[in-house]
Structure formats: structure tokens, C-alpha cells
Amino acid sequence: MIARIWSGRSPLYLLLLPLSWLYGLVALLRRQAYRRGWIRVWRAPLPLVVVGNLTAGGNGKTPLVIWLVEQLQRRGYRVGVVSRGYGGRATCYPLVLGPDTRSVECGDEPLLIAQRTGARVAVAPQRSAAVQALLAQEPLDVVITDDGLQHYALARDMELVVIDGERRFGNGWWLPAGPMRERAARLCSVDAVIVNGGLPRTGEIPMALTGHTLVNLRSGERRVAGQFVTPVVAMAGIGHPPRFFHTLTQLGIPLQATHAFADHQAYQAQVLAALTPQAQPLLMTEKDAVKCRAFAQDNWWYLPVSATLPAEAGDRLLARIAALVAAQPRG
């Protein structure tokens, strides 16, 4: 239902417009308060790059964060990542992720970033506390914030916005009548707009998410998509599950059933086991897999995806970050 409302296919958004106007007014006043110095802004002692979006729901921020971290690491930079840690409940904050940290403590996306990149990751509702926790453990050259565009309490040196190229901004209204956290005009003040899928518009950078090999949650065995010839069951607890199901179909994997869960869903073993009564393969996203490894069955698989950007555009982004680091004394 909410997808129909936000996409503009249902007139029910009209009932939510008063709440949207209130949301928009509060968001505008809040941003102005930070810009005018009425509320204190904390600046990190090193360059900070924000990766965020203007809409609610999954747009591909985390794959871009992973791409940035990996590319910067290859160039010899010491990179840290901070996040709100949505979906996790730690006993205390800030929490710096370690080898035994669970997704229920830190959230699924921070754990995925840490596992994929090996970078130091910290979570806290107050992002400045997360940055300080990272710096207390080891020197860094740059910090990347996963989903912090609207966290104006934290000063930033570079803003990257990811948008879904298929859904764009839906009906264009603020939450809850539409998907917008801020109006589309905010794009005029960011450093780069990265479009995940669809057709990029002038000045936007296209990004594709690619993956062809599935990994077994228990054994780590890898299989190319073409090896799945019998119908499988697919599940996804991400911002936009249909994208994952469409990806599997494009890879030629026959789907017997699909199950969409809420983003950051906390899973129970018996619920997922019931999805495959004939012991069919159960396919999921890598983000879901980090929450299911502890109780995974033998025939559960996940599809890792990686972000790809045009070489020239990607090099420009990395060069701008390198320039920020070069202007900062190295610790």
C-alpha cells in the first residue's frame, strides 16, 4: 500500500498531506538552525564524506560506501566508517565493531561493511561520538558516514547522494505522504549525485550493482547463478525487495516464490525454515545473510553485489577525496 501511495498511483496520499507539511516545516527549520549556528555543529579533525539520500527506503547507499572504502584502501588510505546502526541495540554507545559483534547490536549494514572491507566501523545515534571512538583506537585519513545526509549536527567535507534511478522521488511529497526526507532541490547543494539503475540525468553519475555468484551461508561454497536450475525460494528484507527478485530473474534463476520482509527485519530461524517446506534452496541478499548465519540451513545462499561506476567519474570522486586528505595533516 505504501509503495502505491509514494509512487503516485494512489490518491490516498492526500489524507497524509497535513502530516507531510508538518514534517517538511520541521525539516526546513531544523536545517536552517544548523546553518545559522543556532544549534552547534561538530567538525571532525579529519575529512568526512557523507553518503546519503533524499528518500526513505533502499537506494544503494551501502554498496557505494563499500566501493569507496575499497577504492581508498587500495590507494593506501586509512578509512573508517560511522553509522547510526539502525536496527541494532547495543548496551552502550558508541560501539566499535569487533570480530564478535552481532547484527542485533550494531545493525545489519554496519556489520556488512565491516565484513566486506575489513575497515574499522563504529555506530552511535550521535555520529560525532562514533567518529571520536574510531579515532581513539587508531589514526585515520578519512571517515565515511553511511546514511547521514540529514544528520546536520555533524559537519561534512563532501556530500554524495544516491538515488534509485527507477523510482526517483515517487510523488515528490515529504514523509509520510511521499518518500522525501528533503525536497529534490537539495541536490543542487551536494557534491555528486549517483544514480543506482535507470537512466541518469545530466550531471548524474550512473552506478550499477553487479553479482553473478551465490555463496552458501554455512559452507562458503560458491555457485554461479546458472547452476540453480530448479525453482528456488527468494527472500529479502531490504528497502526495495522487488529489485533483488528482479536481479535473480535477470540472472536466469527460476523463482518458485518470493517473500518480502521489512527493511532491517530481525529474523527467526523457524520462520525462515517454513519458507522452504520441500527443502528448496533459499536465496537472500548479503545484507540478510549477516543476520542469518548463526542458524542457517545447508541450502541457504546469498548473492553478494558490488557497485560499479564509470572509470572517469569514479576517479574524479576519489581524486576529490584525496585532495581533502592531502590538505589535512597526516597523523
UniProtKB/Swiss-Prot annotation:
Keyword annotations from UniProtKB, A to Z: ATP-binding, Kinase, Lipid A biosynthesis, Lipid biosynthesis, Lipid metabolism, Nucleotide-binding, Transferase
Record protein name field: Tetraacyldisaccharide 4'-kinase
GO molecular function: ATP binding; tetraacyldisaccharide 4'-kinase activity
Function of the protein: Transfers the gamma-phosphate of ATP to the 4'-position of a tetraacyldisaccharide 1-phosphate intermediate (termed DS-1-P) to form tetraacyldisaccharide 1,4'-bis-phosphate (lipid IVA).
UniProt pathway: Glycolipid biosynthesis; lipid IV(A) biosynthesis; lipid IV(A) from (3R)-3-hydroxytetradecanoyl-[acyl-carrier-protein] and UDP-N-acetyl-alpha-D-glucosamine: step 6/6
KW Chaperone (keyword) present: no
Gene name, Swiss-Prot/TrEMBL: lpxK
Lineage: superkingdom: Bacteria
Record family assignment: Belongs to the LpxK family.
A family per Pfam: LpxK
Enzyme Commission (EC) number: 2.7.1.130
Annotated ATP binding sites: 55-62
GO CC terms in record: plasma membrane
Biological-process GO terms, alphabetical: lipid A biosynthetic process; lipopolysaccharide core region biosynthetic process
Reaction catalysed by this enzyme: a lipid A disaccharide + ATP = a lipid IVA + ADP + H(+)
